[in-house]
Amino acid sequence: MGEIKTITAEQLQAKVEAEEVLNIIDVREDFEVANGMIPNAVHIPMNTIPEKLDVFDAKQTYYIVCAGGVRSENVCHYLTANGIQAVNMEGGMYSWNGEVK
């Protein structure tokens, strides 16, 4: 697998706090997102990504988030292989110190 783009939790938090328009996809399971998600993130569980490919726009960039950064990295590889621009948030929600909703 090729290299994928990454962003740190701190870098993504700065973008969120600057109110940038972002496409953040949280790929954790339902019970995990019940504890909170990054504001404006969209929840698409990892196992449903293949059937939801049509919701992704190849002209947009998507920031992919999970609990620790491993599942989101796998999703980034999958999306990239399907022509979608995906960026993995390193460390996942364990590294997120910003607001959650």
Residue ranges and their predicted role:
Residues 1-22, 29-61, 70-101:
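Rhodanese-like catalytic fold shared by cysteine-dependent sulfurtransferases
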Residues 65:
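Short, surface-exposed ligand- or partner-binding patches at beta-edge/loop junctions that are enriched
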